[in-house]
Amino acid sequence: MEHTYQYLWIISFVTLPVPMLIGMGLLLFPVSTKKLHRIWAFPSVLLLSIVMVFSIDLFIQQINSSSIYQYVWSWTINNDFSLEFGYLIDPLTSILLILITTVGILVLVYSDSYMSHDQGYLRFFVYMSFFNTSMLGLVTSSNLIQIYIFWELVGMCSYLLIGFWFTRPIVSNACQKAFVTNRVGDFGLLLGILGLYWITGSFEFQDLFEIFNNLIYNNDNEVHFLFVTLCAFLLFSGAIAKSAQFPLHVWLPDAMEGPTPISALIHAATMVAAGIFLVARLLPLFVVIPYIMKLIALIGIITVLLGATLAFAQKDIKRGLAYSTMSQLGYTMLALGMGSYRAALFHLITHAYSKALLFLGSGSIIHSMEVIVGYSPDKSQNMVLMGGLTKHVPITKIAFLLGTLSLCGIPPLACFWSKDEILNDSWSYSPIFAIIAFSTAGLTAFYMFRVYLLTFEGHLNIYFQNYSGKKNSAFYSISLWGKQGSKILKKKMRLLPLLTINNKNNNERASFFCFFWKKIYQTGGTVRKMTCPFITINHFGTKRIFSYPQESDNTILFPMLVLVLFTLFIGAIGIPFNQFNQEEMNFDILSKLLIPSLSLLHQNQNKSVDWYEFVTNSTFSVSIASFGIFIASSLYKPIYSSLQNLKFLNLVAKKGPKRILRDKIINVIYDWSYNRGYIDVFYAISLTEGIRRLAELTSFFDRRVIDGITNGVGFTSFFAGEGIKYVGGGRISFYLLLYLFYVLIFLLISSSIFSSFSSL
């Protein structure tokens, strides 16, 4: 087994050949590489699958052996300095490897169909493969400096993927916002790493933990303790930015401007989990500083509540899920701050699969809506224009519903087990935090079912938008850099555009991961898959052609169905079944896996729970979630609008002082939520405008004062010289007289100054 571990360093580099080969192909055979661009999905999935096989084998060995392996190579050795690189294999690494590879493979398969119409297909897979390489290197790093290198590579890939369609101004602004916000946290992380090295003289985790503990317990110097606390806070600031925790969360909703597969991989399962990974990796260091642990829990509970409330009024389906991600990662951060290491990792796993399912489901919905509204994210992602999709996309609907129920904490789905464990632990930590956490569980159920009901229930609202004559649908393609260009195929009609397809020059292509051949129609030099049937409706004696969303193809549905299985069964790895087993059997896989980490943290490894106590505690949380679902159903389910004609609802709806006051309160809450709590506005006014004005003032001072003094001295010398030239008349005797005169004046001034100082 140890022989196997010696070759695991290759895990981080298995996926690297894909971007290198694509780059070489574009340089040497550009035409052939572009024509055969769809084949590059296969090696991307194949190489990541090889990593997944290694990861599964590693996961099984970790469960059986409960050991930690570390291999390092010295790169630079000096008397006072040594820099080593290597890899660390422990339970945390094995969990993240499984998470990255499984979700990554499913997203790559999904992307083969989702991005097939995009001319930047090759560029997309280059970025994705390089991101997977960076993320694998991050979780296997053996020291802080190595983590920082891969941390920055992950941030760079995130910048490239968010700005994939950078010709759209809103996309370029979003990727810049993500880059700058993460640089704030990364700068703090770098300062924290350098500060820790100055204190301990090492970057290695084991050395850091031992030296740090000795400094804390054996040194009574208050100044030294404050500096150590500051370094720990700076390390935590990097995790705040990367995991979109308050107050550096503002980049995550804007990051949804990237393609939907990116949102599923980066902003649900992997990159935002990097901050959680860093805190979990450094938890033995943080746990000896109570102030830092309290700060981690405080940031977590603020993010939990803030993310849930900001999701209330979002119209964009992906932004709503983004705020949900922010809130759920807050639960994980809260668990780490409370010291519930096992519960935090458990929720990280269950949330990653459930949220990836929801993002891929939203991508399937957007993909279906684009057939009607064209490539226009403002329309295809707007839940106000959706509704009634149940009969059109039934498989997507079921998958999305299961992901929604899981996130709401409904048993027996995955997130129920992990979230309930965090909620139960919060009671023993702080009753106030527990009340907020339980209340947010109800808010989560409310806003998630709001998303579900607006999307799938009722009628397809885009038809009513078109009927009013305000909107007209167009046929869009996506250029190489994501720039939208409309191609209206037929003369616009009042209700919906009449879409016709010329089959004269159509080509048939197949996806590597598609289970049937699909036609791709060539129209005006652009390529677009038409996945929607045309339904002919007789209307006033004439025939009109309407297009409706249709279920996505199998290549998109297959990853969603696999994630459904994870959502249904992944929670079983952390359920404490031990009291029902024989003594020699242990079905609590997660607790058994985390034995080395829990021993390092000096925590109780026996997580068995009395089932009567568990059912009693979970009943309360499920009741709160059910209440949130009920409120969302009563407000957003279409049956509510039909009941408005009933007498008792009309009585409730009558205007009065109390009703007017209630409406004002609701409007204030809605505006606060829709405008993101005015946090972005505050940052724009206080930071962006402040820095801009400071830059303008600095520029003015540089041009007018600094350059003015320099140029003024030059101009003064020039004009003085010109004046003296004409006064002297060319006589040397006159020049000597002026020279003696100025020397005399200088001596008089100097003597007066000297005498004044001597008198003092």
From Swiss-Prot:
- Where does the record say this protein resides? Plastid, Chloroplast thylakoid membrane
Q: Which GO terms describe its molecular function?
A: NADH dehydrogenase (ubiquinone) activity; quinone binding
Q: Which Pfam families match?
A: Proton_antipo_C, Proton_antipo_M, Proton_antipo_N
Q: Name one GO cellular component term.
A: chloroplast thylakoid membrane
Q: What is its main location?
A: plastid
Membrane topology of the entry: Multi-pass membrane protein
A GO biological process of this protein is: electron transport coupled proton transport
Keywords of the record: Chloroplast, Membrane, NAD, NADP, Plastid, Plastoquinone, Quinone, Thylakoid, Translocase, Transmembrane, Transmembrane helix, Transport
Q: Does the keyword Glycoprotein apply?
A: no
Q: How does it assemble?
A: NDH is composed of at least 16 different subunits, 5 of which are encoded in the nucleus.
Which PANTHER family does the protein's record reference?
Answer: NADH-UBIQUINONE OXIDOREDUCTASE CHAIN 5 (PTHR42829:SF2)
NCBIfam families named in the record: NDH_I_L, PRK06590.1
Of which family is this protein a member? Belongs to the complex I subunit 5 family.
Q: What is this protein for, i.e. what is its function? A: NDH shuttles electrons from NAD(P)H:plastoquinone, via FMN and iron-sulfur (Fe-S) centers, to quinones in the photosynthetic chain and possibly in a chloroplast respiratory chain. The immediate electron acceptor for the enzyme in this species is believed to be plastoquinone. Couples the redox reaction to proton translocation, and thus conserves the redox energy in a proton gradient.
Its name, as the record gives it, is NAD(P)H-quinone oxidoreductase subunit 5, chloroplastic
> To which species is this protein native?
Populus trichocarpa (Western balsam poplar)
Gene symbol of the encoding locus? ndhF
